[in-house]
Amino acid sequence: VMMQLEDITQNNNITAGYLISNHIYENHQAELDQLSSRGVDPNVQRVMDFSNLNAHMLSVMPSINVLLIKLYNDQGTLVFATSGLPALGEDDTSTALQQALEGTISTELTAPDDAVDRESPLSGKFYAETYLPVYAGHEGQEIVAVLELYLDVSEQIAGFRSVMVIF
């Protein structure tokens, strides 16, 4: 059942992720190009202005059940986060991020965790964490960034649990 739920949530996350990544690429292509590792001073990456993106994402996220968004450049450096996340400029060495930099999409389901800060949007929620490559234009072209998306799947889990009780 968890494998099926993971597949379903990955498909939901992929759909939401592509909508978001297309918006990011279409409306912030210049920033993404500047954030890529091609000859850019890493210190410049930390001062890029994504305030318009942040405002837009925060307004859209609730309608598609997205809890958090992170954006990494093509070297795995965190360059954008919606809220309450690690400092920009930090490198992420997770396997899922490295795979996304190579074009692979991955999703992991996470149960509510008491260790999560109560102020965090993840607190008390089941969520699916998905890493998606952001391409320059269309899939198959150069990967310019990776989008890490946290989708609230609490309602789906509750629905599956109620169906399991019936059977």
Which residues fall in each region the model found?
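Helix-start (N-cap) segments at beta->loop->alpha junctions
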Residues: 112-116, 135-136, 148-165
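Extracytoplasmic/periplasmic sensor domains and loops in membrane signaling proteins
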Residues: 46-50, 83-125
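Amphipathic alpha-helical regulatory segments at dimerization interfaces
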Residues: 23, 54-63, 96-100
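Extracellular/periplasmic ligand-binding regions of membrane signal-transduction receptors
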Residues: 13-52, 74-79
